[in-house]
Regions:
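Cys/His-rich Zn2+-binding cysteine-cluster or related metal-binding knuckle/ribbon modules and their
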Residues: 2-8, 17, 27-92
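Solvent-exposed alpha-helical segments within well-ordered globular domains of core cellular machineries
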Residues: 9-13, 27-31, 42, 46, ...
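Conserved, well-folded catalytic cores of nucleic-acid-processing
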Residues: 14, 18, 36, 51-54, ...
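Conserved phosphate/pyrophosphate-binding and hydrolysis machinery centered on Walker-type P-loop NTPases
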Residues: 19, 38, 51, 63, ...
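Extended interfacial segments that mediate partner engagement and assembly in macromolecular machines
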Residues: 26, 75-141
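Residue-level signal for pocket-adjacent positions within structured domains
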Residues: 28, 43, 56, 68, ...
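Long C-terminal interaction/binding lobes of large macromolecular proteins
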Residues: 102, 129-141, 146-199
Length: 199
Protein backbone atom coordinates (compact mmCIF):
# COMPACT_ATOMS: atom_id res chain seq x y z
CA UNK A 1 0.00 0.00 0.00
CA UNK A 2 1.32 3.44 -0.97
CA UNK A 3 1.30 5.93 1.91
CA UNK A 4 2.70 8.91 0.03
CA UNK A 5 2.15 10.59 -3.30
CA UNK A 6 4.08 9.38 -6.33
CA UNK A 7 6.36 12.45 -6.24
CA UNK A 8 7.25 11.99 -2.56
CA UNK A 9 7.92 8.28 -3.11
CA UNK A 10 10.15 9.14 -6.06
CA UNK A 11 12.07 11.70 -3.96
CA UNK A 12 12.52 9.18 -1.12
CA UNK A 13 13.75 6.58 -3.59
CA UNK A 14 16.27 8.97 -5.17
CA UNK A 15 17.59 10.15 -1.79
CA UNK A 16 18.01 6.56 -0.60
CA UNK A 17 20.55 6.00 -3.41
CA UNK A 18 22.97 8.39 -1.65
CA UNK A 19 25.74 6.73 0.41
CA UNK A 20 24.89 6.44 4.09
CA UNK A 21 21.22 7.26 3.51
CA UNK A 22 18.84 4.42 4.28
CA UNK A 23 15.06 4.40 3.72
CA UNK A 24 14.26 6.12 7.06
CA UNK A 25 16.85 8.88 6.55
CA UNK A 26 15.66 9.35 2.96
CA UNK A 27 12.09 9.72 4.22
CA UNK A 28 13.16 12.33 6.83
CA UNK A 29 15.13 14.27 4.22
CA UNK A 30 12.27 14.14 1.72
CA UNK A 31 9.80 15.59 4.21
CA UNK A 32 12.32 18.18 5.34
CA UNK A 33 12.76 19.27 1.71
CA UNK A 34 8.98 19.40 1.25
CA UNK A 35 8.71 21.77 4.24
CA UNK A 36 11.58 24.04 3.17
CA UNK A 37 10.75 27.46 1.68
CA UNK A 38 10.57 27.28 -2.11
CA UNK A 39 13.60 29.56 -2.60
CA UNK A 40 15.77 27.26 -0.43
CA UNK A 41 14.68 24.23 -2.45
CA UNK A 42 15.58 26.10 -5.64
CA UNK A 43 19.01 27.01 -4.19
CA UNK A 44 19.59 23.37 -3.24
CA UNK A 45 18.68 22.06 -6.70
CA UNK A 46 20.71 24.83 -8.34
CA UNK A 47 23.76 23.96 -6.18
CA UNK A 48 23.49 20.26 -7.04
CA UNK A 49 23.06 20.96 -10.76
CA UNK A 50 25.82 23.59 -10.77
CA UNK A 51 28.29 21.32 -8.98
CA UNK A 52 27.52 18.43 -11.32
CA UNK A 53 28.01 20.63 -14.41
CA UNK A 54 31.07 22.63 -13.27
CA UNK A 55 33.13 20.15 -11.24
CA UNK A 56 35.73 18.17 -13.17
CA UNK A 57 39.02 16.35 -12.63
CA UNK A 58 42.17 18.41 -12.14
CA UNK A 59 44.30 18.02 -15.26
CA UNK A 60 47.30 17.04 -13.13
CA UNK A 61 46.26 15.24 -9.91
CA UNK A 62 42.70 14.16 -10.82
CA UNK A 63 41.07 15.63 -7.71
CA UNK A 64 37.67 17.24 -8.10
CA UNK A 65 37.85 20.95 -8.89
CA UNK A 66 36.09 23.68 -10.83
CA UNK A 67 39.32 24.85 -12.51
CA UNK A 68 41.63 23.20 -15.04
CA UNK A 69 44.23 22.92 -12.25
CA UNK A 70 43.18 22.57 -8.62
CA UNK A 71 44.46 25.11 -6.03
CA UNK A 72 47.09 22.62 -4.80
CA UNK A 73 48.59 21.86 -8.22
CA UNK A 74 48.58 25.54 -9.19
CA UNK A 75 50.36 26.59 -5.96
CA UNK A 76 54.06 27.25 -6.76
CA UNK A 77 54.97 26.95 -3.05
CA UNK A 78 54.13 23.23 -3.04
CA UNK A 79 56.98 20.71 -3.35
CA UNK A 80 55.97 18.96 -6.58
CA UNK A 81 58.75 16.35 -6.34
CA UNK A 82 56.73 14.21 -3.90
CA UNK A 83 53.30 12.83 -4.75
CA UNK A 84 50.95 11.36 -2.16
CA UNK A 85 48.57 8.85 -3.77
CA UNK A 86 45.11 8.73 -2.16
CA UNK A 87 41.91 6.89 -3.03
CA UNK A 88 39.56 9.89 -3.18
CA UNK A 89 39.23 13.65 -2.75
CA UNK A 90 37.95 13.18 0.83
CA UNK A 91 41.27 11.52 1.77
CA UNK A 92 43.15 14.44 0.20
CA UNK A 93 41.05 16.83 2.30
CA UNK A 94 41.85 14.84 5.46
CA UNK A 95 45.61 15.35 4.90
CA UNK A 96 45.11 18.99 3.94
CA UNK A 97 43.33 19.61 7.27
CA UNK A 98 46.57 18.73 9.09
CA UNK A 99 48.16 21.83 7.55
CA UNK A 100 51.54 20.03 7.55
CA UNK A 101 51.71 18.29 4.17
CA UNK A 102 53.14 20.78 1.66
CA UNK A 103 53.66 18.52 -1.32
CA UNK A 104 51.23 17.39 -4.05
CA UNK A 105 48.72 14.56 -4.49
CA UNK A 106 47.32 12.11 -6.98
CA UNK A 107 43.70 10.95 -6.56
CA UNK A 108 42.85 7.47 -7.85
CA UNK A 109 39.06 7.69 -7.44
CA UNK A 110 38.88 4.14 -6.19
CA UNK A 111 40.91 1.08 -5.28
CA UNK A 112 41.56 -2.21 -7.03
CA UNK A 113 38.89 -4.71 -6.02
CA UNK A 114 38.62 -7.92 -8.06
CA UNK A 115 35.55 -8.91 -6.00
CA UNK A 116 33.74 -5.78 -7.24
CA UNK A 117 35.16 -6.03 -10.75
CA UNK A 118 37.37 -2.94 -10.30
CA UNK A 119 40.73 -3.40 -11.99
CA UNK A 120 43.77 -1.13 -12.50
CA UNK A 121 42.22 0.37 -15.65
CA UNK A 122 39.16 1.51 -13.67
CA UNK A 123 41.12 3.91 -11.43
CA UNK A 124 43.43 6.81 -12.33
CA UNK A 125 46.70 4.83 -12.55
CA UNK A 126 47.52 5.73 -16.17
CA UNK A 127 47.46 9.41 -15.22
CA UNK A 128 49.81 8.73 -12.28
CA UNK A 129 52.29 6.85 -14.47
CA UNK A 130 52.17 9.65 -17.05
CA UNK A 131 53.08 12.15 -14.32
CA UNK A 132 56.03 10.01 -13.27
CA UNK A 133 57.32 10.06 -16.86
CA UNK A 134 56.82 13.79 -17.48
CA UNK A 135 57.59 15.38 -14.08
CA UNK A 136 60.67 15.39 -11.83
CA UNK A 137 59.36 13.07 -9.10
CA UNK A 138 61.62 11.85 -6.27
CA UNK A 139 59.10 10.02 -4.10
CA UNK A 140 55.61 8.54 -4.27
CA UNK A 141 53.88 8.13 -0.89
CA UNK A 142 51.08 5.58 -1.11
CA UNK A 143 48.30 6.58 1.30
CA UNK A 144 45.51 4.27 0.27
CA UNK A 145 43.19 3.00 2.99
CA UNK A 146 44.32 0.03 5.09
CA UNK A 147 41.51 -2.17 3.73
CA UNK A 148 42.19 -5.25 1.60
CA UNK A 149 41.46 -3.16 -1.52
CA UNK A 150 43.75 -0.36 -0.33
CA UNK A 151 46.60 -2.79 0.39
CA UNK A 152 46.12 -4.52 -2.97
CA UNK A 153 46.24 -1.14 -4.71
CA UNK A 154 49.36 -0.10 -2.77
CA UNK A 155 51.23 -3.27 -3.74
CA UNK A 156 50.17 -2.94 -7.38
CA UNK A 157 51.35 0.70 -7.54
CA UNK A 158 54.62 -0.22 -5.83
CA UNK A 159 55.34 -2.92 -8.43
CA UNK A 160 54.56 -0.47 -11.26
CA UNK A 161 56.87 2.25 -9.91
CA UNK A 162 59.84 0.19 -8.62
CA UNK A 163 61.50 -0.21 -12.07
CA UNK A 164 61.59 3.61 -12.49
CA UNK A 165 63.99 4.07 -9.55
CA UNK A 166 61.62 6.55 -7.87
CA UNK A 167 61.35 6.05 -4.10
CA UNK A 168 58.04 4.40 -3.15
CA UNK A 169 56.82 4.52 0.45
CA UNK A 170 53.66 3.54 2.32
CA UNK A 171 52.12 5.41 5.23
CA UNK A 172 52.79 3.65 8.53
CA UNK A 173 50.28 1.72 10.52
CA UNK A 174 48.40 3.64 13.15
CA UNK A 175 45.55 3.94 10.75
CA UNK A 176 43.28 1.06 11.79
CA UNK A 177 42.88 -1.87 9.41
CA UNK A 178 39.84 -1.25 7.26
CA UNK A 179 39.77 2.41 8.35
CA UNK A 180 38.98 5.19 5.90
CA UNK A 181 41.48 8.07 6.02
CA UNK A 182 38.74 10.70 5.99
CA UNK A 183 37.63 9.61 9.48
CA UNK A 184 41.09 9.56 11.10
CA UNK A 185 42.20 12.48 13.29
CA UNK A 186 44.98 14.83 12.12
CA UNK A 187 47.59 13.67 14.67
CA UNK A 188 47.23 10.02 13.63
CA UNK A 189 47.47 10.99 9.95
CA UNK A 190 50.65 13.00 10.58
CA UNK A 191 52.24 10.14 12.55
CA UNK A 192 51.34 7.71 9.76
CA UNK A 193 52.98 10.04 7.22
CA UNK A 194 56.11 10.63 9.34
CA UNK A 195 56.50 6.89 10.00
CA UNK A 196 56.12 5.85 6.37
CA UNK A 197 58.21 2.91 5.20
CA UNK A 198 59.83 2.17 1.86
CA UNK A 199 58.20 -0.56 -0.21
Amino acid sequence: MEYYSTHINKLIEQLSHLPGIGPKSAQRLAFHIMNMPKDQVEQLTSSITGAREKIRYCRKCCTLTDQELCPICSNPKRDASTIMVVENTRDLAAYEKTGKYERVYHVLHGAISPMLGIGPDDIRLKELMKRLQTEEIKEVIIATNSSLEGETTAMYISKLIKPTGIRVSRIASGVPVGGDLEYIDEVTLLRALEGRVDL
